[in-house]
Amino acid sequence: MKNLLALTALLAPIALIAPDVAEAQGVVTSADPRATEAGLEILNAGGSAADAAVAMMLALTVVEPQSSGIGGGGFMLHQTANGPLETIDGREKAPAAATPQRFVGADGKPLPFIQAFPGGKSVGVPGNIRLAALANKKWGKLRWKALFAPAIRLAEGGYKVTRPLAAASTNLAPLWGGGSTAVAGPEGGTSTGTGAAGGRFPDAAELYTRNGKPLVEGETVTNPALGKLLRKIAADGPDAFYTGQNAKALINAVTATRIAPSDMTAADLAAYQAKERPPVCGTYRGYKICGMAPPSSGATTVLQMLGMLERFDLARLGKDSPIAWHLIGEAMQLAYADRELYLGDTDFVDVPVAGLIDKGYIAQRSGLISETRALGTYEPGTPPGAKPRTYAPQQEVPGTTHFVAIDAEGDIATMTSTIEGPFGSQLIANGFALNNELTDFSLAPEKNGAPVANRVEGGKRPLSSMAPTIVYDASGAPIFTVGAAGGKTILMQVTKAIIAHLDWKLPAKEALGLGLIYFNKDGLVLEQGTSLPAMKPALEAMGHKVSVGRLGLKANAAEKTATGWIGAPDPRSVGTALRQ
């Protein structure tokens, strides 16, 4: 029976310890303090881990609108104490009328990303509300309506603007009103472009600017339209999002815009369903690692990187060794090459998941890695069961959010949620930002005359880097869970955190805070402001091309210790962890 305790009658005071906390009973962590508090409120009211995760997703819709929300989608892993690991795919879908030519210009060439992401055509059918409803049905203890209370209070009563929200408003405000804009990650801009001017996105400007000026950290924002919608969905169930007035508002937003109007229909919304998929699992140094199946590339790519590194003694090398980071960089680029060629929505393309994580295949790929010299060229391999594919890498903008809830019974809900780039498509419906997830498809439908696996197709879910992950010890007990935000860096952030925790024995807080190595078309990128840039000369001596830069990172994790679970947000973020 659903627990009917009033949410206002908290059984214990909120205990906030930043950036990590030890568990008394349940533990929650997210990238925003108000969302973390929402999760704790639900746990204190008798809610389950899944209930708390749903409440955090809803609260993040309000207070972290640049990163995620009900206008987007997500993936949830749920581990029942002494029970099965299950997953829910709430990834957005392309409208039924979408074709592979969606992002091809009049000249027959794929649009530049800066032109493709704003407006209606980039919006996928949102999945988070269906995901939330399925999670509450399967694992919930509280009634559906109760999960909305914290988010409704924030939307109607107001919330203070954080540094990341202010930065995103500053970066995107020129686009809303015309002129040039920086496409921002969680903490800043990553690329710049210019579009047609003249108040292109007035609804976003109305919500997230003041008198034409960007939001300022510390000022108070309310969102009564979103509060009203949340009340409606809370009272009437998930269909209130996918049908009726909200469906009309959403369809109007994406079809009536003068910026790339969409072909999405009310039927597309009404037909959307979240999907349960079997998890994808593998092993690393005796530990079991589990994550999402496609259309997430999380489990396959993370397991490939870890598998290629398993023959190297990373523990002996240590976190301060340039050789260790060289090896990680090599495995990363080989695994990402496979990702770009083979991964996509398995409802539309054959993805050789088993072959990609096959031990023999991974050993073959690992054999390409030298301890002393960069490979230089990182081509996809041919895993068992693979069909010929066309290689067409696609850009992802840093964004997204991750959060974790663990309840007193030991159930774990770990979820990554997104609208893709900051403020998604820049379109607003009933106070929530609409995603630009369809730009996660390959903008080029074919290459050298052959179709690309991740091309746009009607009803298809785009490939995703979201990678909620759970690590189990040799006895099968969960000991670590992690996920991240930041576009394609997510996969490397998760892998780095696992290596730091398992090989280098760092606690969750330090594992997340450790610097990151990534790559672009010009070579390796070392995260500035960390210990890694000091390794630039050593890596260059091994044959790498190396630059230093900001990467827009944001992760959350929880680890099991002798005294219970400990939650940790990324020290780069404004996130928190709370305990009961």
Regions found by a protein language model. Give the residues of each.
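Bacterial N-terminal signal peptides
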Residues: 6-16
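Noncatalytic scaffold domains of N-terminal-nucleophile
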Residues: 19-37, 41, 47-50, 54-236, ...
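Active-site rim segments in enzyme catalytic domains, especially the processed small/beta chain
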Residues: 62-69, 75-87, 258-265, 411-475, ...
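Short, small/polar residue-rich loop motifs at catalytic or cofactor-binding pockets
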Residues: 276, 397-400, 464-466
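Glycine-rich phosphate/pyrophosphate-binding beta-alpha loops
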Residues: 290-299, 400-404, 414-426, 484-491
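Internal maturation/activation junctions in enzymes
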Residues: 311-418, 570
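Extended C-terminal subregions enriched in glycine
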Residues: 459-461, 494, 503-550
